[in-house]
Every structure is written in structure tokens, then in C-alpha cells.
Swiss-Prot record, chains A, B:
Pfam families associated with the record: URO-D
Site (Transition state stabilizer): D74
Record text on subunit structure and interactions: Homodimer.
PROSITE patterns the record matches: UROD_1 (PS00906), UROD_2 (PS00907)
UniProt-annotated binding residues for substrate: R25, Q26, A27, G28, R29, D74, Y151, S206, H325
GO MF annotation terms: uroporphyrinogen decarboxylase activity
Protein name: Uroporphyrinogen decarboxylase
GO CC, alphabetical: cytosol
Highest taxon above the source species: Bacteria
Alphabetical UniProt keywords: Cytoplasm, Decarboxylase, Lyase, Porphyrin biosynthesis
Cross-referenced InterPro entries: UROD/MetE-like_sf, Uroporphyrinogen_deCO2ase_HemE, Uroporphyrinogen_deCOase
CDD domains: URO-D
Protein encoded by which gene: hemE
Family: Belongs to the uroporphyrinogen decarboxylase family.
Length: 351, 351
């Protein structure tokens, strides 16, 4: 049914003619076409207006030729749906009020009806699927519980996660109660996204690397596993990608959540990751996003290196080319276009 | 000659009766005694006034009972000595002017006479050694070339290192020219610190984890090796610690610089690091600094875990207990004191 299903085939580790590519934050500020829409509307309104969210979701498919679309939204819509007031000033910072720091604060958070409180995301997915007309798959996503927990407890972004860690270390039961509550919403939310038409799900654990291995095992991984298993129980054919950025020492345990793909930051050579994980999951990544500041020759050389480091494909292997984190707002779109075209061409030799 | 030489013995992997402990930023804002001095003087003036630098350097030795002192200073004194204007507002941010972005900018930077431009650090070391009166060893330090390069090129702190990476990817020769110039000063500077009395040297590569493995191999490691070898050539008995925070995938290559100890962030279980490195270097680290926000029981449990994870000592092993990064300014000093006392007592069972 999909005209280009390479992305899903790679996630399922089925034979592909070449490596598919999409990039995190591909619907974003680096595109003048995105900025034109943002001039007329603020960030959260854009997330909440399905027609506009659909439009910016499809922009990189049409303008850049990526092999997958990802629904335009923000991980913090989950916090908002649970009853927090969320302010996002895209260039400046994030504020959530009130910060969640006591049992009473946790009790006040609701477990919302996803169809009700996050219906606008589901509407945007349905509309995008329709307009995409099966050109490429559509990715749904959520932040992971630990990352959303840090925003809730800190009341915004954070350097050292002081309040989040204080709760974990002084009131671990309370921390788990909040994490469980968030995780329950995430599970419902990602399943509802699949129901609305999302072809794959990515769980973003952006602040994963702030935790020690054991803290990650206690406060992050079990919830990710819960979310992955929630999707798998209802939709066994829908691939799930877990992106626990820079958790390079516990890749194997991330794969053990039952996900189909492990997303990598650029801190590890993808060859090493493949050596550790074998071909039991697909790997997604992992070029340094700042390489897109480089010359065309440098961009091609670095992309070629990622493909070469991943190496030859087998009947069980899967690789989705991506950056190791989001594309930066001041990148020249021509450089992304060049990357996409180069990866499409160059990767064929490894398949 | 030293009354307590455990820190140096651990770095040299000689038998110790227990594990020595110091913590990064131990002379700092969490101590009311430090804040009392800072109320009367700004940060850089404190660095440049040997009597005051000596006083805050010794505070944690007397108040906390740590097994080593580290000279109070800042990594950016090297940038300043090379001709940049450096402003440090401890709670707000760092500004270096002008940012170094062209060949002409690089040419204008000087390779200073360390005795002249950084004489105040050497004076502070001499004075501190005298007043310490051999109670514990004194650590000298420098930022690594890559980290100082990012400050120079960005003109301050940075989130994505856009300008630094642009130079690396578009003008790699120019980047290497700047890195070489900085590295030459670092080598002179750390040797001068030893000459003035420093008993060990630590190289801080604070922003190490912003680089891919290959970029780290090209733009960071060779300069660290140059600095380590500069010390070793002149002072073979003086231990050098390399702290390339969160470079957990290339620990073995860090050890190959010829350093005596590898500093670890808290992102890797120290047992894994020891498995990778064997006992060919001492390991320094690696408790999450935010554990000091925890209850006394939690602090002891986590410290005990680091010691247990490191495991039993052999005739060739070395472990210096430390946090995985600097102690945070809002930590209760009583919690550090508790940690120091606990590590001293608990660690004996592993020796």
C-alpha cells in the first residue's frame, strides 16, 4: 500500500534496496517554509492546529525527499494533557507550572482521556496520513517517562536535574509514582497514535544520559519497556524505535525492551553498536548534526563513513540513516537535501 | 615527606590501606567559608591573588578531610594568557572576546611566557605547598586543548559548539593550528605547575563528549597525549590524570595517552571501565554528584556501590574516589563530609 516502505522494511530488518533516511526535527526552523508558517502562529498553536501540523509535517517529505514523515508535535503535550501549564518559547526555553514536587502535586495530575486531551495530535495524524497518500510512512512519537518526569519536576529545562534527582534519591517511591503515572499516559498515547494511523513509534529519552547505569535501569528503562510492550501487545507489526541518547554502555538492555530499533547519538561508532547488538535490532543514526555545517565534500565523506561503519547488510540487518540528534535551526536546507540524496545513492552498495 | 600520600600511591597503583578521595570543585560555592571570601572579591581576582587562592584551596582539606588539594583556579586562565579578554560571572556565564574564528584571530593570539602571564597560579601553588606543609598532595590542572578551543571559538559556553564544529569541518587545518597553539601553552603551563610544586596534574576535557569517536581521535586525543608526554618527559614520577568526561566508548585510547589515571563520569559502571582497562591505569570516579542531594543512607549506599563495583584491589590496581563531575553549589557541606568519612572507612575492606 505504501509507495515507499523502505523505512518500515529497515525497522523490521527486511531486505532493502538502499538505506532509508529521515532526520530528527526535519519539520523545523531550518526550513524557510516552516518559518513562514511560524511567523503567523506560536509553537503550541501550531502543534494544536491539525491543518498546520500536517503542512509542516509534509514539508520535509516534499522539499527534502526523506523516506519517512514524523508528526509535528512536542513531547511536552503529554505533560500539558496531565494538567500542567506548559509554555514553550522555541528559542528561549520551556516553563511548566506548577513544578511537581510533592505527593499532593502528583495526585493533582490527571490521567487524561487521550482522545479528548490529545485529540488534536490524533486529528493531525489522520489528516497527514490522508494528504501523504501513502508516499512514505508516518512516525508517531512520545517523550519517555524519565525525560517528561524531569520537565515536570524541574518545571522546565535543567542543567543538573537537581529537583528530579532529589526526588529520586530522597523519595524514590514518590518518583516511581510520578513516573508510573506519566508512563501510563504515554502507553495510551502511542497506541492511540497507531490507531489514528501512525506507521511506527519513536520514544525519545532526550535526557537519558543524565543517569548512571543503575539509575537508568531503575528509573527509566522499565517505563520504556512498558511503553514498547503496550504497543507490541496491541499492534505487533508496528515498529518501535527507542532513542535513549548517549546511553552507549547499556545498548543491549535497551534492545531488551523489545523495541525494533535502537537510536544512537554520535558518541559511539555505529560499527561498535552493531558489534554489541548484532543484528537483533535495527540501528538508527548517527551522524553528528553539526556535520551539516560542513562543506558538501565533508558532508558526503561523513555520511559515507557512517554507511561504511555500519557495513554490509545481511538478511537480518537494518539501518535507518539519521542524525545523532535534531537538525540545528541554522543549517542550510541545501545541505540536508545533499545529505538525503547522497545517502540514497551511496547506501545501495551495502545492500 | 608527605604525611598522607595515599592519593599519589593510588595514582601510581601502589598498595594503599584504603581508597583516597577528593572531589572536583571541592574548593567552591557549596562551602560557606568559600562564599565568605567570594563576597569580598570576584572570581578572577580570587584566582589571581595567591593568598586568597591558597586559602580556598586549603579549606576542603581542613574542613572536609579530603586526601588531596587542587589549586584553586580556572581552566580559562590559559585563554586569557593567550590574549583573550575573559569574563566569568560564576552563576551566569562566560564571555571571551573577541571570539577566535579566522586565521588572523589565531595569529593575534600569543604563546605567552607562562612564568610571566600565569605567574600568579605558580605563586599560588608555591604558597599553598608551603602552608599545606605536606599534609596532602597538591593537584595542578589545565583544561584540555579541545575544551579551551571551544571557549575560544564560541566566545563562551555553548550548547551545540556550532562555531567550533564549523571550523573543524570547514577549515580543519586552521582548527589544528589553533589547537596546536593552545596545546603548546598547556604543556608549558602544566610543567611549570609541577616545577612550582604540584604533585600531580589533571587535564580536564569537560566538553569531550560533544565529539564523535573519530573527531575525538583527530581533534582532541593527540593534544592530550602531547600534554601528558610533556609532563612525563620532564617529570616521569608525576602522575597525570585525564578526565575526558563521558568518553566511555574510547577509554582504552585515553589510557594510551600514557596517563596514569583515567577520570570517569557517572555514565559508566566503574566495574565495566575496570574490565575494559584492566589495571593498567588508575581509575578516578565516579559517583553522580547529585547523590549528595540524597539522604545520609542513600549517600552511603551509593558510595558503597562505587567501591563494590570497583572491587577488590590487586598489587597493580588503583582507585581514587571522586564524583563524576564537580560538586554542585547547593549541596550541604555536611553531606560531603559524610561521604569523605564513609569512603575512608568503607574502602579499607577492598585493600
Amino acid at each position: 500500500m505504501l509507495k515507499n516502505d523502505l523505512f518500515l522494511r529497515a525497522l523490521k530488518r527486511q531486505p532493502c534496496s538502499r538505506t532509508p533516511i529521515w532526520v530528527m526535527r526535519q519539520a523545523g526552523r531550518y526550513l524557510p517554509e516552516y518559518r513562514a508558517i511560524r511567523e503567523k502562529t506560536d509553537f503550541l498553536t501550531l502543534c494544536k492546529t491539525p491543518e498546520l501540523a500536517m503542512e509542516v509535517t509534509i514539508q520535509p517529505v516534499e522539499l527534502m525527499g526523506v523516506d519517512a514523515a514524523i508528526i509535528f508535535s512536542d513531547i511536552l503535550v503529554v505533560n500539558e494533557a496531565m494538567g500542567m501549564d506548559v509554555e514553550i518559547i522555541e528559542t528561549k526555553g520551556i516553563k511548566l507550572t506548577p513544578p511537581i514536587r510533592s505527593q499532593a502535586d502528583i495526585n493533582r495530575l490527571i490521567i487524561p482521556e487521550v482522545q479528548d486531551k490529545l485529540g488534536y495530535v490524533l486529528d493531525a495524524i489522520r489528516l497527514t496520513k490522508k494528504v501523504l497518500d501513502n508516499r512514505v510512512p508516518l512516525i508517531g512519537f512520545s517523550g519517555a517517562a524519565w525525560t517528561l518526569f524531569t520537565y515536570a519536576v524541574e518545571g522546565g529545562g535543567s542543567k543538573n536535574y537537581a529537583f528530579a534527582k532529589k526526588m529520586m534519591y530522597r523519595e524514590p517511591k514518590m518518583a516511581h509514582m510520578l513516573l508510573s503515572k506519566i508512563s501510563a499516559v504515554i502507553s495510551e498515547y502511542v497506541c492511540a497514535q497507531v490507531e489514528a494511523g501512525a506507521d511506527a513509534i519513536q520514544i525519545f529519552d532526550s535526557w537519558a544520559s543524565a543517569l548512571s547505569e543503575d539509575d537508568y535501569r531503575e528509573f527509566a528503562l522499565p517505563y520504556i519497556k512498558e511503553n514498547v510492550q503496550a504497543v507490541k501487545a496491541k499492534y505487533p507489526d508496528v515498529p518501535v524505535i527507542v532513542f535513549s541518547k548517549d546511553c552507549n554502555t547499556i545498548l543491549s538492555e535497551i534492545a531488551d525492551t523489545g523495541c525494533d530499533a535502537v537510536g544512537l547519538g554520535w558518541g559511539i561508532d555505529i560499527k561498535k553498536a552493531r558489534t554489541i547488538l548484532g543484528d537483533r535490532v535495527c540501528l538508527q543514526g548517527n551522524m553528528d548534526p553539526t556535520v551539516l555545517y560542513g562543506t558538501p565534500e565533508k558532508i558526503k565523506a561523513e555520511a559515507a563513513k557512517v554507511l561504511r561503519q555500519f557495513g554490509q547488510h545481511t538478511a537480518q540487518s537494518g539501518h535507518v540513516f539519521n542524525l545523532g540528534h535534531g537538525i540545528l535551526p541554522d543549517v542550510d536546507p541545501a545541505n540536508l537535501k545533499l545529505l538525503v540524496e547522497f545517502v540514497k545513492e551511496e547506501s545501495a552498495k551495502y545492500h
